[in-house]
Structures are given as C-alpha cells and as structure tokens.
C-alpha cells in the first residue's frame, strides 16, 4: 500500500522533486505502451502523463528554498503519482524500469533520474515499426508502442504532419521536460 499525501510533498527538495516526478512519467508511459494495458489503465496513463507535463516543471521550480510555494502543482503531481501507480500495478512496467534499477544501484543514481536518462532510448527501442510477437505471452496482441507514443505526443500537443514526426516531437518534448527540471 502507498499513502500519497500532497501535504507531505510540499517541501520536497528539488532533486527529489525532479527524480520522483520523472519516475511518475515513466510509470504512466510504460504502463500505457505495455502489452498488458487495458481500457481501464489507458485513461489513467493518459491523465497521469498530461499532469506530469503540465505540473512537474512548476512543482520543481517551487522546490527551491526562495521560491514561491505551488500547492496546486504539488497536489497534481501527487495525484499523477497515485493514478500512474494504479495503472502500472495492473498493466506492469517495462525495460526502462528494469534497466534503471540496475543503473541506479550500480552508479548510485536516483531511480527517477536513471529512468529519465534511459527514457528516450527505450522509447526508440520500443517503437520499432515491425515488432515481433513474443511466444512467452502468445495470448497478448503485438506490441503497439509506436502508436501509443504517437497518441501521447498528440495528447501533450506536439503533433507532427506524420506519425513519425509526432513520435520525434514526443521524444523532443520528453527531452525538453528533462531540461526544464535540470536533469
């Protein structure tokens, strides 16, 4: 069980805010592109993703000692965390989290920061246009990560003229988010 209380997050320091915030994004996105995603989890993933893009930079800026508090951004990030947690508990996570646990543990990198460093590479790997169906989970459909990333790009407002452009814009937006929070 997790207790997510925005009041406890109001004074979270900048590095913890950036790392935990990008971890929330990774939870939501990995659950959304999962072959185990369902109609139940999809909406949660989309909502959490949108909230992270809308509120993580604000929450991060409010984390500095001399900054004006932003309780709305903190509360929205707490909600995004809870929503993404419910989604990934049902749809599961992917290789980004698997790799970041090892990378973070070995090099003493905060978990969310490790997720952020790997995220664009994992998105590109997962977005192969001709994925193969895994025999291990033969009852599940083919991976459709590329289409899912395109949907998320459209959701956050970075649509291109083609799906490929939208995907590239999605990657750029995720990279920009990292810059906005100094990762």
Regions from the PLM with identified roles:
Residues 1-91:
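Carboxylate- and glycine-rich phosphate/diphosphate-binding segment that chelates Mg2+/Mn2+
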Residues 10, 101-105, 133-137:
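Short beta-alpha connecting loops at secondary-structure transitions
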Residues 25-29, 77-85, 99, 119, ...:
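Short alpha-helical scaffolding segments that buttress acidic/His motifs in well-ordered protein cores
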Residues 43-47, 51, 76-79, 98-101, ...:
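Amphipathic alpha-helical interaction segments
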Residues 57, 86-89, 93, 124, ...:
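Charged/polar positions within long, soluble alpha-helices
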Residues 82-115:
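Glycine-rich phosphate/pyrophosphate-binding beta-alpha loops
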Residues 109, 113-183:
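Gly/Pro-rich interdomain helix-loop hinge
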């Amino acid at each position: 069980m997790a207790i997510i209380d925005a009041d406890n997050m109001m004074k979270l320091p900048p590095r913890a805010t950036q790392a935990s915030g990008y971890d929330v994004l990774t939870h939501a996105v990995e659950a959304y592109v999962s072959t185990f995603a369902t109609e139940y989890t999809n909406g949660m993933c989309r909502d959490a993703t949108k909230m992270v893009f809308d509120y993580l930079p604000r929450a991060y800026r409010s984390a500095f000692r001399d900054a004006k508090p932003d309780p709305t951004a903190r509360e929205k990030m707490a909600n995004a965390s809870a929503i993404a947690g419910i989604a990934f508990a049902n749809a599961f996570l992917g290789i980004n989290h698997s790799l970041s646990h090892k990378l973070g543990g070995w090099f003493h990198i905060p978990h969310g920061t490790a997720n952020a460093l790997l995220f664009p590479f994992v998105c590109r790997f997962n977005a192969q246009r001709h994925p193969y169906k895994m025999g291990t989970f033969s009852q599940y459909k083919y991976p459709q990560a590329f289409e899912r990333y395109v949907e998320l790009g459209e959701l956050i407002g970075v649509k291109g003229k083609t799906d490929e452009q939208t995907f590239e814009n999605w990657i750029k937006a995720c990279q920009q988010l990292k810059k906005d929070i100094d990762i």
